[in-house]
Amino acid sequence: MCTLQLHLLLLVVLMLSETARPQPSSTARAFPTSWGLEPVTPEVPTSAPPDSSESPTPWTLSMPVNATTDPFPALPICVCDLTPGTCDLNCCCDKDCDLLHPRTVFSFCLPGSVRSSSWVCVDNSLMFRSNSPFPSRVFTDSSGTTQFCVRVNNSKANYFQKLQTVNATNFQALAAEFGGQSFPSMPPETQPPVLFYRAGDPILTYYPSWSVVSLLRQPAAVGAGGLCAESNPAGFLESKSTTCPRFFRDLASSCTSEPALDAASYYNFRVLKVPRGVTDLQNMKFQVPVTLASQASPPLLAGNTCQNIVSQVVYEIETNGTFGIQKVSVSFRQTNLTVKPGVSLQQDFIVHFRAFQQRKAAAPAAPRSGNPGYLTGKPLLVLTGDTSHSMTLLQSEGNGLCSAKRHAVQFGVNAVSGCQLRPREVNCSHLQEEVYQTLHGRPRPEHVAVFGNADPAQRGGWTRILSRDCSVSAVNCTSCCLIPVSLEIQVLWAHLGLQSNPQAHVAGARFLYQCKSVQEHQRGIEVSLTTLVNFVDITQKPEPPRDQPRIDWKLPFDFFFPFKAALSRGASVQKDSLVLILCVLLLGLLNSQTK
């Protein structure tokens, strides 16, 4: 009996060992090509599975004991060996490096310098023992699953491309199958001119002397020799510079006849502002002349020297969006060249674009009243037209009359001032104008700056001042004139931003007038004027942060309901059972008496 059990145990072990051997199956997965060099013999699991884009880290790779493997496989073509007689960096197939193990010297091997390898992997639990003739590894992925992988040496990436045979019979078929878009054999049809230039469009020029439309040229180097090509057009809004040489066999004859050496050939034309100007060449509003930014003299042959030849051309082009080109200027740098056979000249061509700006007198930068929020005590900034200044109040002289000098309104500071005005005019309209100018100052403020660093060019940083002049219809007197005698400037402001660093800004402002009627055409009158400024803080304080809610344990009113119900039900049951017992005893007693 023991012998039979021993035989059965040996049979099971043999069956398990046979099934554990690596067999080709549908569960094996081939991984794409990766670059490797030589095998590593230690059998240690790795922490990363083989990837299709990266080479598996050579941690666990076993080799047969008697196998002979070339650790530096020779390739028929070494694509990275670009320097003869010199070792190219990271080129593992370069024979000039004379390295047996290139990876020990290089940080990596360039693609194409080593043979590709593919991996076939199965679950590691299926493997009992491996006797594969190929290098093997055990990988562990991030989820902890281990895989047993075998590297094969016949990767498809090492196969050669199929060479196409081209002859007169299949030439057209191959060109149609693999060919793409090419240059059109016929020039495209002429399209109607667009309304405005787009970035990269060639710039149109017009020569009035010959009535010819051409393009603004920017010669550039072309070909292996880098000679100047005149046909290169300048692109709209593409600021760039080009450099190219010119060679002259006979400079003596070319000195005065070659257009490329004459500065006049670079400005004796007009530039079209927009492409649609080509439809009306007689309309000068679509054309911009090329102006000279520097003096340029014509070429001159003096003895053995060619003088005043162009060595640099600089175009400055100002554009204004869809309105096109507004101004074109050109400047030159000229030099002299000695006449000799095969002489050369290096020329530079620069085209620079910039935005068109109306020329204005530069105004000094006004000081800020804060950055960005207003600072208390700094002037309140106002705007009239495009001019920024500070708001002012009346100022009186020693005799009480209104002075030409005025007090500046300081942000956050309430103030009041007054003076006596002796009008020079007696006409009502002129009198009203004089009084208004005295109250407001000149010029009259129209907008107030929201922040202390407001820019006059940015209208979004200013808010209009609300005002309403005195109503003439409110006076019934025909010979009376209604004039303002008091001006109250109300400024609403608030803090913005963090409470630790608040920024004051103006939310709005208005002028409030108190009016008075005076007799028209009355000479020698004096009018008492008053101005006051009032700053109102409308800052809304945020709600203070609340504490964490405190725990207030309260039991519901029916928390003990189940227990009460059970107790009440138990009492009723006890009461019913007592009644039942009494009934049984009573029946027993009656039965005993009847017997």
Swiss-Prot record:
Q: Where is composition skewed (Polar residues) in this entry?
A: 49-62
Where it sits in the cell: the answer is:
Membrane
Per the record, ranges on the Extracellular side are 23-575
Record's keyword terms, sorted: Apoptosis, Cilium biogenesis/degradation, Glycoprotein, Membrane, Signal, Transmembrane, Transmembrane helix
Alphabetical GO biological process terms: apoptotic process; cilium assembly; positive regulation of apoptotic process; smoothened signaling pathway
- Transmembrane helix listed as a keyword: yes
The answer to whether keyword Lyase applies is no
> Which family does the similarity line name?
Belongs to the tectonic family.
* Quaternary data: Part of the tectonic-like complex (also named B9 complex).
Name assigned to this protein = Tectonic-3
Q: Which gene encodes it?
A: Tctn3
